[in-house]
Curated annotation (Swiss-Prot):
Pathway annotation from the record: Cofactor biosynthesis; iron-sulfur cluster biosynthesis
Native source species: Salmonella choleraesuis (strain SC-B67)
GO cellular component labels: cytoplasm
Catalysed reactions, as listed in the record: (sulfur carrier)-H + L-cysteine = (sulfur carrier)-SH + L-alanine; L-selenocysteine + AH2 = hydrogenselenide + L-alanine + A + H(+)
Protein's job: Cysteine desulfurases mobilize the sulfur from L-cysteine to yield L-alanine, an essential step in sulfur metabolism for biosynthesis of a variety of sulfur-containing biomolecules. Component of the suf operon, which is activated and required under specific conditions such as oxidative stress and iron limitation. Acts as a potent selenocysteine lyase in vitro, that mobilizes selenium from L-selenocysteine. Selenocysteine lyase activity is however unsure in vivo.
Active site: C364
Protein name as it appears in the record: Cysteine desulfurase
Molecular function GO terms recorded: cysteine desulfurase activity; pyridoxal phosphate binding; selenocysteine lyase activity
UniProt keyword annotations, A-Z: Cytoplasm, Lyase, Pyridoxal phosphate, Transferase
Positions bearing N6-(pyridoxal phosphate)lysine: K226
Pfam families in alphabetical order: Aminotran_5
One annotated GO biological process: cysteine metabolic process
Length: 406
């Protein structure tokens, strides 16, 4: 069955607009995806007709808002096949989720002389929190190097593990290269050494089904805004037994059981003890609508369509004169490139003149830029609403830029 891309595009109002007098070709979904009417309407309806502060309210609006929020927790748990909804913490996004793990689990479990393993392709959100933790604790940060094609040098991984390895923190899919890492093999190796595993799923959950039980990871984190949902909301999954042992990392309302000026404070049970303060309830409602939306289309069908479009894009871009493509042939979501010796910002600015939106810069992956020896790259990302015609416009735009700039 053909993927209904035109029907999907009709659900995204922003795709009807023009930029510089030309139809918008939005090729920046890896930074943040656009939102369908279903998400916009769900969040708007909540604020129009159902808004109230959640927790402890005895009135109808508060009770209904609380129920709606907890229903999204259950929905998200089914989406990633968690064993229980109580294994999911609402966070602002992937970055906060990783920082929560570093500051809660990490503070309790990392000691001087321990080590944490990451890779050279990580987003800063999966580098900096571990650097900060290691510096604070006197631990070591070890790095899996890359092959030139943008895949991990897995032959070096076993040697990085030892009896002081406490955590493997790895991206599911690179936000620059599109590399999908072989998580089952990597997690199995971590298990041999008794290490925990955190997976940054920010660039994975919108492209194919994720099953955290099958992966057997300890932590999995993703953001709503890359999944066609609102900004400011994400999900941190933690295995229940592990989550119950973790102390809170932020204090305030909603995360307590009792507070006494003389006897101290006791915490709420997990996951609520990790959700201090008033939550982003509207964002949570929007996230639920986004999960509904992609589920109704079928992640398998979305993935098949995106892979077909990716193959076409790689074939066509390879024909652009003087282009350098980064990353493996088999990839998800993104294509990073440079055009001759022209700076990525210049190329991106020209493309914007043609109504084409791409991301330029270091993509919050400065160590990866250093490995490739470039200050920046252009990145085109492909989502379920992109088309062959938009790829053709990108190719034509780059060819024109090459002719203009030489």
């Amino acid at each position: 069955m053909t993927f209904p891309v035109e029907k999907v595009r009709a659900d995204f109002p922003i795709l009807q607009r023009e930029v510089n007098g030309l139809p918008l070709a939005y090729l920046d979904s890896a930074a943040s995806a656009q939102k369908p009417n279903q998400v916009i309407d769900a969040e708007s309806a909540f604020y129009r007709h159902g808004y109230a502060a959640v927790h402890r309210g005895i009135h109808t609006l508060s009770a209904q808002a609380t129920e709606s929020m907890e229903n999204v927790r259950k929905q998200a748990s089914r989406f990633i096949n968690a064993r229980s909804a109580e294994e999911l913490v609402f966070v602002r996004g992937t970055t906060e989720g990783i920082n929560l793990v570093a500051n809660s689990w990490g503070t309790e479990n990392i000691r001087a002389g321990d080590n944490i393993i990451i890779s050279e392709m990580e987003h800063h959100a999966n580098i900096v929190p571990w650097q900060m933790l290691c510096e604070r604790k006197g631990a070591e940060l070890r790095v899996i190097p890359l092959h030139p094609d943008g895949t991990l040098r897995l032959e070096t991984l076993a040697a990085l593990f030892d009896d002081r390895t406490r955590l493997l923190a790895i991206t599911h899919v690179s936000n620059v290269l599109g590399t999908e890492n072989p998580l089952p093999d990597m997690i199995a190796l971590a298990r041999q050494h008794g290490a925990k595993v955190l997976v940054d799923g920010a660039q994975a959950v919108m492209h194919h089904v994720v099953d955290v039980q099958a992966l057997d990871c300890d932590f999995y984190v993703f953001s709503g805004h890359k999944l066609y949902g609102p900004t400011g909301i994400g999900i941190l999954y933690v295995k229940e037994a592990l989550l119950q042992e973790m102390p809170p990392w932020e204090g305030g309302g909603s995360m307590i059981s009792t507070v006494s000026l003389t006897q101290g404070t006791t915490w709420a049970k997990a996951p609520w003890r990790f959700e201090a303060g008033t939550p982003n309830t509207g964002g949570i409602i929007g996230l639920g609508a986004a999960i509904d939306y992609v589920t109704s289309l079928g992640l398998d069908k979305i993935g098949d369509y995106e892979q077909m479009l990716m193959r076409y894009a790689l074939e066509q871009l390879a024909q652009v004169p003087d282009i350098t493509l980064y990353g493996p042939a088999q990839r998800l979501g993104v294509i990073a490139f440079n055009l001759g010796k022209h700076h990525a910002y210049d190329v991106g600015s020209f493309l914007d003149n043609y109504g084409i939106a791409v991301r330029t810069g270091h993509h919050c992956a400065m160590p990866l830029m250093a490995w490739y020896g470039v200050p920046a790259m252009c990145r085109a990302s492909l989502a379920m609403y992109n088309t062959h015609e938009e790829v053709d416009r990108l190719v034509a735009g780059l060819t024109r830029i090459h002719r203009l700039l030489g």
